[in-house]
Amino acid sequence: MPTREISLILLSTLQCNAACEYCFEHRAPDRLTIDRLEVLIGKVLDYLQSQSIGSLTIYWQGGEAMLVSPDWYDHAYDLISEAAAKRGVAIRHCLQSNLLAYTKEWNPLIARMFGNSIGTSVDYPNLHRKLPGRSPAHYDKMWLRKLREAQ
């Protein structure tokens, strides 16, 4: 019998560094605290264990997920890994980002937590994604530069 799996989307922050015209987020300064994450993950993992569900994929999104520091994600990774191991649940993490906050300081975390993979997206033609006070063309140039840096 195949292992049953659940997917969970977690928003580490609602903040964003872009000004996309179609965005529905309120850009509140709220961030997911480690204490809140610990409670949430405990409840999710307890439920999975009670239902004999052995695998959880966590999709980290936002706002913009990379506006939370790599250190925060390191702490979150350790907390989640330990809690999941105690309950026999396999965990996989995925990161969705606009890449605008990417720097090489993210590389160790991306390797450790996200399997050297980041999800991103592009609009073509880009009519609505932009940085505050800038054009969509400026956003595209910045995104392409960050994409090359992340390779």
Q: What would you call each of these model-derived segments?
A:
Residues 39:
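N-terminal binding-site loop/beta-alpha segment at the start of enzyme catalytic domains
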Residues 63-64:
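Active-site neighborhood of divalent metal-dependent phosphoester/pyrophosphate hydrolases
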